[in-house]
A protein has these predicted regions:
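A short glycine-enriched loop-to-beta-strand structural element that forms part of the catalytic core
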Residues: 60, 96, 100-107, 129-157
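Short catalytic/binding micro-motifs of nucleotide second-messenger systems
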Residues: 51, 86-91, 120-131
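Short low-complexity stretches enriched in small and charged residues
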Residues: 14-22, 59-62, 90-93
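Conserved long alpha-helical elements within nucleotide-processing catalytic cores of c-di-GMP signaling
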Residues: 28-30, 34-49, 53-61, 67-86, ...
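Short, internal active-site loops enriched in acidic
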Residues: 66-70, 141-144
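Short, low-complexity N-terminal regulatory "tails/caps" that precede and couple sensory modules
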Residues: 1-31
Length: 164
């Protein structure tokens, strides 16, 4: 049973003799939300950029931040991550990038990113915590752009949309 819980949480059972069990994080998934961990997300991003350059497809990243003036507990983060998983397509890479920051990598243009983001936000306004809000931004990959400049441009988009 412990082994199954560890696998679901993104951990690997290292040793399990008697009542003493130790777990190690697998580095691929966030232990709380079961979404992709940042290193795994950035590796997927690099692969998708290479694929986009070869196949001339559109690639867009959406960055979502959960905001609240009150403390956010683990249950809220888990339900937020579950809603991300259920609101976006199966083939979209979804990750927890920071404490309250999430990233979604989609194959599609900005119109699709806007449509999927609005659908997610409307569902969170119904199902989510009343004291929390969601900010988001998206950026479409430009051919020949490096992964770091792509992510930096996404950060700039979020700053332009925010109130700071």
């Amino acid at each position: 049973m412990e082994r199954m819980r560890a696998c679901l949480a993104g951990s690997v059972l290292i040793s399990g003799k008697g009542s003493s069990m130790s777990f190690a994080h697998d580095g691929l998934h966030d232990q709380l939300t079961r979404l992709a961990a940042p290193p795994h997300f950035y590796e997927i991003l690099r692969r998708e950029i290479a694929l986009t350059n070869r196949n001339f497809t559109d690639l867009t990243v959406i960055r979502v931040i959960l905001n609240s003036n009150l403390p956010l507990y683990e249950a809220t983060l888990i339900s937020f991550a579950d809603l991300i998983t259920n609101s976006f397509r199966y083939e979209d890479a979804k990750a927890r990038l920071g404490e309250f920051e999430f990233g979604i990598l989609i194959r599609g243009d900005e119109a699709l990113a806007e449509q999927l983001s609005r659908r997610f936000i409307s569902r969170w306004s119904i199902d989510g915590t009343p004291d929390s809000t969601v900010s988001y931004a998206y950026a479409k990959y430009s051919k020949g752009e490096s992964a770091i400049s792509f992510i930096n441009r996404l950060d700039d988009q979020l700053l332009l949309k925010s109130d700071f």
